[in-house]
Amino acid sequence: MAESTAFHDLATFLALPRVSSLALSPDGTRLVTAVQELSADGTRFVGALWEVDPAGQRPARRLTRSGRGESAPRFLPDGTLLFLSSRPVADPGEGEEDKQEAALWSLPAGGGEASQLLARAGGIGEYTTATGSARIAFGASLLPGATDAEHDERLREARRKAKVSAILHESVPVRYWDQDLGPAVPHMFTVADAAEGGAAAVDCGARRAAIAQGVALSPDGSLVAYATAVGSLPDEIRSVVVVANAETGKPLRMLESPEAEFDAPAFTPDGRDLVCSRSRRVTWDAPGDVTLWLASATDEQDAGRDLLPDFDQWPGAPVVSPVPDDDGAPVVYFTADENGHGPVFRLSAGSGELVALTASGTYSDVVVSPDGGTVYALRSAVDSPPTPVRLDAAAAGQQPVALPCPGQDTVLPGGLTEVHTTAEDGTALRAWLVLPDGAGPENPAPLLLWVHGGPQNSWNAWSWRWSPWVAAAAGYAVLMPDPALSTGYGQHMHERGWTHWGGTPYDDVMALTDAALLRDDLDGERTAMMGGSYGGYMANWIATRTDRFKAIVTHASLWNMYSFAQVTDFPAYWMRRQGDPLVTTERYERESPHLRAARITTPMLVIHGDKDYRVPIGEGLALWNDLARFEVPAKFLYFPDEGHWILKPNNVRLWYTTVLNFLAHHVLGEEWQRPDLV
């Protein structure tokens, strides 16, 4: 009998600790991470800060505890630990209403009680610190007409008392993912010393923070760089990086281009230059590209230069070492998807020398020690949840040293292998294959095909939302292909799928499925397909093309490309790729699954959240109505209070339960069981 694991029981699975983010103290002796766990009543995930021993000798130690949780740890130069929390300053029962906005809190370096440093009526958002200054930069919003924080608070109180919720828009966009934008406008502020409070905060400018992320302070705190968005017409809106004087708020320069997006700024150790992410904008026939860009922080005449002209993958946000190389050039670390993994890379900005520090796994939240000799990061993989690790800052192909932290003793209900094949055009294709315990020639496992979202994405990291191990615990094998449009396989992989999202990617998915089913430990007669977002689009596309699967689960999926392009939260991107649906109809006619609804015969489970603004609920409703119209066996799992992702613990439990019950009915031939509470 197979060993029971946390994945065999959804309550136990949801209670597993979830590690995210890292912060390193200025002296390099303290490493802090955030760990989410279930609340006592099981209805929320609550974060807490834990200190991890950088040497890996001592067990992790919990630093914070509150009902609201803590996140986003960062250090000040004196060792004070900062974090965000919506915990109340005092018991709300003693007076003030508990409004639950996130504020900036601090823990003294020598220990003691946490105290609130900065609070705003609309909450504190993205923030950062300087390595050699007490200055802090933080994001907060102001209502139109507000002249300062106090005025803003009065205006908010007036809206609350009047019970006004209306938002008057005069520009696009109006929504982003699951957020309604406005009426308050995000701004970037700096404060010379957070201990003095926010009254003296300097306003460095309004920003469209929802669609442009990243803020950095120069080491001495004199400059602030932050991403924002410019442009008024939908097709003109793009992300740029603004550099401002952190003491006065005066803008000094802007990194921008009509053909590119800039974000994720990081200063070099001397504060003179910036390293940013630069993304070429997509067009009708080109899928865009990503690189890292080096430019002067203050000289507007310096257009900058590409740091990775010959690198064929897409780098993530740059992290600049506090110590330059022997020639005085900046040393930049970044991660990038590569062949089903996500290594940490080290780049010398002077020589262009590039080294992959890791051989396997996918990394995030990279931080560098003060002496530049050690790198810390979170490592995950399809078969390993995120955990903090230590790396030598220069050695290639390392196996990282795991540092003791909650959530490391996870036993899996199966194993992981790979499937390889070759596309018709000669492109090498690969996929991960999760095999449940007990699968073999005498007991072949039913197969689930999972197509990832994006579509410019990769199955290369742990997922709590789409865990193949929950499916494996139920006895399924899970095939996780990286077809055309996936990241980590060079620019050619994007280009070969860009002009027909239902063409080459579909062919690749089918080719990898066929290759997997050559194995004698998989049952080709019991198969199903699942996907979310673009993966949901592919689910719908597959449903109109073949009846080979016993069931299809489509989550947050695109159905009618004509209507979708007009109502998604960021239509400019889609129109640049697809054209105006009222003028250039070719791609819509070729790619929209709804035009082929009458072909569908496979039973389908449709899942959608009402607060999904990326793929609005109308897509799920239209699909559901078409399935009913053509009498396709189907069910519709609707979440009125969720967005593109299902995040609330008991909704997550219901998501998995409904999916598994639907599959058991149609793939395994079991009687349908309606989940409890729906």
Label the predicted regions:
Residues 1-18, 52-71, 95-100, 105-123, ...:
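Multi-bladed beta-propeller domains
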Residues 31-35, 81-85, 137-139, 223-227, ...:
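Residue position within the beta-strands of beta-propeller blades
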Residues 404-519, 523-525, 532, 564-571:
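Cap/lid segment of the alpha/beta-hydrolase catalytic domain
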Residues 23-30, 72-80, 127-135, 215-223, ...:
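Blade-terminus and WD-like Trp-Asp/Gly-His loop motifs, strongest in beta-propeller folds
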Residues 481-678:
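Active-site-proximal cap/loop segments of hydrolase catalytic domains
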Residues 46-48, 95-101, 141-191, 238-239, ...:
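Predominantly five- to eight-bladed beta-propeller fold
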Residues 41-46, 90-101, 179-184, 233-239, ...:
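Short, solvent-exposed loop/turn segments at conserved positions within beta-propeller repeat blades
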Residues 11-47, 183-186, 215:
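Beta-strand-rich domains and repeat architectures in extracellular enzymes and scaffolds
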